[in-house]
Amino acid sequence: PASCTSIGDYAFDGCQALTAFSVAEGNSAYCAEDGVLFSADQSMLIRYPQAREETGYAVPDACRTLGDWSFIGASTLEQIDLNQVTAIGEDCFYYCTALKNIAVPDGVTQLNGAVFAYCTSLEQVTLPDTMQTLGDYCFYSDVALADINIPDGVTQLGEKCFYNCGALLELSLPASITEIGEKALGYYTNADGKDDQRIDKLNIRNEGSAAVRAYERSWKHASLWKWLLAGGIAVVVAGGITVIVLVHRSRNRIRTTTRQASATKPGKRK
C-alpha cells in the first residue's frame, strides 16, 4: 500500500510461491520494477521474488546495493548481471541452486555472511581487484565451484569460507592475506555425513602470506592428528632416534605409550 514506509527483517522469509511484487502509486519508500522490490529511487534492491521463473536477471543500472537476503532461494536463476552494484548484503544469494557463474563488479570490497552459500551449481566466480574480505561461510557448500580468483588486496578469508567445496582443487592465495578463519578451505562433509574431512587433492598456492603458510601447515597435519586421536601409531625420527608412539582411546580419554625402537648414530647405517 501507499502508506507502507518500513519493511522488517525476514518479512518475506519462506514465501516460496511469491512471483512478483507490486507497490501502490504514491508510495514514497518503495517501488516495484518488473515485479522486483526496490527502494523508491531504485538504489537498493530489497527482494527478488523467490518463485519467479526466469533463468536470467540484470540488476538495473541505478541500483548500487543488494540488500540482505535479497535473492535468497531464487532457485531458477542461472545468470545474474550485477552491473553497477557496489555493495552486497549478507546471505544475498543463499540457496540460489541454479546459479552457474557470477562476476562481482568493481567497487565491491567485501562479501560478508553466507553470500553464496549452498549455490550448488556455481562453477565460476570472478572477484574484482577492489575485494578485501571474504566473510564467514561465504561460499559454503558450493560443491561445483572449481574456478575462483582471489585478487591481491584480499586480507581475510572467514571461517568455513570455502567449506565443502569439493571441486575446488587449486587455489592461489595472495601475499596480502593476513587472517584465515577456522576450516576456511580444504575441508568437506563426506557421503556418510562425517564433518571436517580433509580434501587431500587441494593444491594451495601461497604467494607469500605468513597466514597462508601457517594455515597450510595446520591443514596438512589435520588428518594425522585426527587419526592419532582415533587411535593409531606415529613414528617419529629425531636426532637419529626412532620413537614409536601408540595412542589408545578409552571412554573418551587418550593414553599414549612411547617406545624407543632404535638408536642410530648419524651417518652410520646398520
Q: Which residues make up each language-model segment?
A:
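Structural signature of tandem-repeat unit edges
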Residues: P1-S6, C15-G35, A40-T65, A74-A87, ...
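Intrinsically disordered, low-complexity polyampholyte segments enriched for Lys and acidic residues
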Residues: K100, N112, N149, K160, ...
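Short, aromatic-rich amphipathic segments at membrane interfaces
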Residues: A214-L228
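Selective detector of the "anchor" transmembrane alpha-helix that sits immediately C-terminal
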Residues: W227-L246
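Cytoplasmic C-terminal tails of single-pass
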Residues: N252-K270
